[in-house]
Amino acid sequence: MSASDLTSVQAAAPQGRRQILVTSALPYANGQIHIGHLVEYIQTDIWVRTLRMHGHEVYYIGADDTHGTPVMLRAEKEGLTPKQLIERVWAEHKRDFDSFGVSFDNFYSTDSEENRQLSEKIYLALKDNGLIAEREIEQAYDPVKEMFLPDRFIKGECPKCHAKDQYGDSCEVCGSTYLPTELLNPYSVVSGATPVRKTSKHYFFRLSDPRCETFLREWVSGLAQPEATNKMREWLGDAGEAKLADWDISRDAPYFGFEIPGAPGKYFYVWLDAPVGYYASFKNLCDRKGIDFDAWIRAGSSAEQYHFIGKDILYFHTLFWPAMLQFSGHRTPTNVFAHGFLTVDGAKMSKSRGTFITAQSYIDTGLNPEWLRYYFAAKLNATMEDIDLNLDDFQARVNSDLVGKYVNIASRAAGFLIKRFDGRVQDSAMNHPLVAKLREAIPQIAAHYEAREYGRALRHTMELADEVNAYVDGAKPWELAKDPANAVALHETCSVSLEAFRLLSLALKPVLPRVAEAVEAFFGIAPLAWADAAKPLSSAQPIKAYQHLMTRVDAKQIEALLAANRDSLQADATAAGGAGAATAKGAKAAKADAKPVSAKAPAANGADDATISIDDFAKIDLRIAKIVACQAVEGSDKLLQLTLDVGEEKTRNVFSGIKSAYQPEQLVGKLTVMVANLAPRKMKFGLSEGMVLAASATDEKAEPGLYILEPHSGAKPGMRVK
């Protein structure tokens, strides 16, 4: 099925049973699952559950991405074999996905015999098709570790701007890209040795072949996301531009992965066998369940195939992967859905602030996984926009929507129905206008989910919940219960409320599967599907005793979560001479706990402020930062906008009032010191994610000048100042 057929297929969903294969990107097997990862898995899981509730044959497939140099080196560092490491990490990842209700039909590993066979089969088919080329290339080689070095395992001086400590493929200061062999004064990140240049035969997938370009131009027209289509067209260029480059699909020994057939000492690059791992995991499931694997993945298959990914790996999934499949005799993806990144409280996740939150720490702290599923769903739509986890909003929204609006409906009605009416609903109440309105809304809500417009689905659902609560408030069952003469009205009110609650639970089931399961047990009904909107509660089936379905989010739980993920300042404070220093409780806590000092009180030795305790100092997280970009702020005569590398996954944006002292180009490439745990501040010009430190005289008029702090060479981004 082509991507352009998606709309007609979706329109036919209620009539025909579809065969649908769905994947999420494979987590790399050298680290923990964190909440940034969970955005994708929760997004995919909601979509999969939506389709299952239509009765379609849906398989949700995943695996750990296990091959490559980083896994090999980490295993060596931990004194393990690579296989021992990936087995341990697999168990951790599976535990985390299970905790958050991610309903994989199979979660496997790319280090499997199925993946080896499929990778070899695809490679040999591409070779037979004239799409594999052999070339001698020159690479950096570590003479100490006796291994060729991937681009990211070499650092040195940028050949363009001469910035130090730049990676082997691109400069973070000037943005230039280059070959690793062009790097000046290079060194191995693995051993510190100076790499030597060595030639080696490598194997390339000929993506530049006109056949690939022609195919991709046609295939891209069916992508559902305009942003993805535009990006693909940018990569492809105009017809005749020949912008596509061949792709190096091989790596030299030592390497943890699959050896290329007929090429001893050469291994498939991880990005070749990783997407093939989708099929390998599915084949493992098919072999165990008796499913016809070939019928799903062969060219021309009527089955649908969807990949959910982060926007940072769009290139691999919309260029290499579909071309590999097309020219190896397989079906191509029906569509690829990319999502944006996650920020926390308006800033990128940070270990120092405790917002680099792991899945396991969330569970260990006692937070309900369905709270996060709901919050992410409320923020997600069909675009590639980034989403923000605002922790205050998280608490408020979960408490208001799920507890205050949704769960509250059942708790207000169930007791009366059990006590007064033997737990049996009034059958005539199932035709109440409010119930009819909710029932009619279910198909639209389901359509929003299938279109990946989860925010719309939940807004619609909560609007209906508001109407149900307004109905209960108007009927006042607690007042009706005081007079036996109101028994019929009380029975109707409770019955309408509980049928409305059943329909709301149906609407929320893709997002809150465990709550839905508890609701099904409460009503004594079979697992809810979309068709069950037309199957109301019946007096023939009494409800069970009501069990509380969800608690409120407590601010203390969030504080504990941040503390669990924050780099401890205890050791640093003690090393500085303070005994019994307390661990900081986050930027907000630090701000709240800080004791004000008098600006008028002169301190000893002419210092500007009164003394502070070592505990107070321990709350401030000072870090080395590299200024990778700098520009003047339009509309401000004081501010410069700095882009800082603080040793985290992403750079930080900081506005600093030092424009009078520096030209932007003077600062690029310099190291400085920043306050890393200062709460992000929304400014007229954007969000500032910290503060850089600068010195000035007490009397700036008599002695003007601003001087940013510069550490000695040898300091690196992310190092703590202590």
UniProtKB/Swiss-Prot annotation:
Binds 1 zinc ion per subunit. Zn(2+) binds at residues 158, 161, 171, 174. Its cofactor is Zn(2+). ATP binds at residue 351. GO terms for cellular component: cytosol. Its EC number is 6.1.1.10. Gene3D superfamilies: HUPs, Isoleucyl-tRNA Synthetase, Domain 1, Methionyl-tRNA synthetase, Zn-domain, Nucleic acid-binding proteins. The keyword Aminoacyl-tRNA synthetase applies. The gene is metG. This is Methionine--tRNA ligase. It holds the Pfam family tRNA-synt_1g. It is found in: Cytoplasm. Keywords: Aminoacyl-tRNA synthetase, ATP-binding, Cytoplasm, Ligase, Metal-binding, Nucleotide-binding, Protein biosynthesis, RNA-binding, tRNA-binding, Zinc. Residues 616-722 form the tRNA-binding domain. GO terms for biological process: methionyl-tRNA aminoacylation. It comes from Burkholderia multivorans (strain ATCC 17616 / 249). CDD domains: Anticodon_Ia_Met (cd07957), MetRS_core (cd00814), tRNA_bind_EcMetRS_like (cd02800). The lineage of its organism: Bacteria, Pseudomonadati, Pseudomonadota, Betaproteobacteria, Burkholderiales. InterPro entries: aa-tRNA-synth_I_CS, Anticodon_Met, Met-tRNA-synth_bsu_C, Met-tRNA_ligase_1, Met-tRNA_synth, Methionyl/Leucyl_tRNA_Synth, MetRS_core, MetRS_Zn.
